[in-house]
Structures are given as C-alpha cells and as structure tokens.
UniProtKB/Swiss-Prot annotation:
UniProt-recorded Gene Ontology molecular function terms: deoxyribonuclease I activity; DNA binding; DNA nuclease activity
Intrachain disulfide bonds: C187-C224
Enzyme's top EC category: hydrolase
Name of the gene encoding the protein in the UniProt record: DNASE1L1
Name recorded for this polypeptide: Deoxyribonuclease-1-like 1
Source organism (scientific name): Homo sapiens
GO terms for biological process, alphabetical: DNA catabolic process; DNA metabolic process
Main location: endoplasmic reticulum
Pfam families: Exo_endo_phos
GO cellular component term of the entry, any: nucleus
Length: 302
C-alpha cells in the first residue's frame, strides 16, 4: 500500500469511536461523602471514563450531592457536558436508594425512562429503566436496566429480572438490552450452582460479559463477582469491544483504606466499538484539509 493511501485509510478509520457504559455501587453516597475532597476527586475521575454511568446506592436525602458531583464533573472533563437522570427514592422502609445516570449529553440522550412496576414487591429497589440514543446507524438506541439486589433475596430478584427484560423488550420493541449493576451474584449471596439455574443463564441470548471469578470488590480479603453486566441482542453484542471491572485503587494509586473511602466495589464497564456500526459521520475540517493535500498523490495526472 502506498504511503498516501495508507494515511487516508488511517484517517477514515480514526473516525470511529468507542462508547463506554458503566455501573458503580458508590456505597452509601451522601452529601457529606462527596464533600470530602479525595472522594470527590476520585468519583469525578471514575465518572469521566464513561459515556453513561449508572450510580447505585445513592442515599442522599438532601438532594444536593448529585448536583454538586455533576458540577465538579463538568469542570473536570473537557470532552463535553454531562447531564443526569435520577430515579425516585426506592425502598421498602426508611432506608431508600436512588439510581442515577450520568451521561455525556453531546453523545447520547435519554429517549424515555420509567421505574418498573413491581406489583408483587419482589425487588427491594425496582429497576429504573432508561432508553438512550447511540451515535450509531446499526444500533441507534439501547435500553439499560440497572438493579441493585438485596443480599437476602438475590436469586428471587435475579429471576424476576428476566421478567423485567421481557416487559422492557416488548415495551420498546427491542431486544438490545443491557442489564447491569450490583447483583450480589457470587460468594455467600449466590452459589455458582444456583447462579447457573437462573433464567438469565439458561435462556439463550444473554451474555454475562463480566466473567465468573472476576473480582469486583476492593478489599483484599474478598474475591467476589458481585457486579455484573449482561448483554442481550445481536446488534448490541456485535458492537462489544471490551468488558471488565475497573480497578480504580491500582489505577489511581490508592491504598485499600483510601479506596474504601470511595466504595468497597469496583465499577464494571463495557465498551461498545461503534466503528463496527459503519455509521456515516461527517468528516472534520482537519480530515478534509488532509484529503485536499493528498489528492494530487492519490489521483496522479495521466
């Protein structure tokens, strides 16, 4: 391949983009917690990795923690403004939690959302379902279903999550769904034998992309795959590039004690490679300029 042709190929290939979706149990996130400088700094750095992040275990009753966190995130990250979408407070007693989506609003928008109607009261914190747009012609939208199970009813809640999937896929006429969150799906909360009997494991089409055995906990004394991401849909799966827990203590050089001030969980992440979507994107001015400079070499005179 001639040099100009190779350069042109690289220019066009670089028009592709990755899209990262994350879930993080932020462990009793309150205003007092985010007001601590190291906690705020670390949370902002974690959030800035993601195009969509769903935070779990937000227990702030003041209503001020998320706006403060959003303000600092937008000050930190220069790749475009973030917005948030919060569920109502969810729970059965005085202890209530909120699911909060942070998303880069120049890359994705909320198309619709609702709290799952848990008529049988199976879930301690019913899923807060949201449909997001994606910058892709192959997969223009995607449904996210977050769930933070209670350890005492993991198996029951995860079996009910299959019913949520059925309702959601019918509601939006889409099979492209990601189930994600702190499922507590390991160790004492759910044995491997019981895990493998879940409908989300036995029914075809569900891909558990955080591998069994991958540690999603901060403490050195634990090794549990509590946090999960489950993909469904051929289009969604075809775009999958990577999936992993993010070991933020190692990446940010934190001691275990410092990391536990943030959370006892790692975030879990999936990266969709939208380059495989073959979406048509407008060429930047830089690319157009380079093409004009290369044109005499690409099309030599006869």
């Amino acid at each position: 391949m001639h040099y100009p042709t190779a350069l042109l190929f690289l220019i066009l290939a670089n028009g592709a983009q990755a899209f990262r979706i994350c879930a993080f149990n932020a462990q009793r996130l309150t205003l007092a917690k985010v007001a601590r400088e190291q906690v705020m700094d670390t949370l902002v750095r974690i959030l800035a990795r993601c195009d969509i992040m769903v935070l779990q275990e937000v227990v702030d009753s003041s209503g001020s923690a998320i706006p403060l966190l959003l303000r600092e995130l937008n000050r930190f990250d220069g790749s475009g403004p973030y917005s948030t979408l919060s569920s109502p407070q969810l729970g059965r007693s005085t202890y209530m939690e909120t699911y909060v989506y942070f998303y880069r609003s120049h890359k994705t928008q909320v198309l619709s959302s609702y709290v799952y109607n848990d008529e049988d009261d199976v879930f301690a914190r019913e899923p807060f379902v949201a449909q997001f747009s994606l910058p892709s012609n192959v997969l223009p939208s995607l449904v996210l279903v977050p769930l933070h199970t209670t350890p005492k009813a993991v198996e029951k809640e995860l079996n009910a999550l299959y019913d949520v999937f059925l309702e959601v896929s019918q509601h939006w006429q889409s099979k492209d769904v990601i189930l994600l969150g702190d499922f507590n799906a390991d160790c004492a909360s759910l044995t491997k034998k019981r895990l493998d009997k879940l409908e989300l494991r036995t029914e075809p089409g569900f891909h558990w992309v955080i591998a069994d055995g991958e540690d999603t906990t901060v403490r050195a004394s634990t090794h549990c795959t509590y946090d999960r991401v489950v993909l469904h849909g051929e289009r969604c799966r075809s775009l999958l590039h990577t999936a992993a827990a993010f070991d933020f203590p190692t990446s940010f050089q934190l001691t275990e004690e410092e990391a536990l001030n943030i959370s006892d969980h790692y975030p879990v992440e999936v990266e969709l490679k939208l380059s495989q979507a073959h979406s048509v994107q407008p060429l930047s001015l830089t690319v157009l300029l380079l093409l004009s400079l290369l044109s005499p070499q690409l099309c030599p005179a006869a």
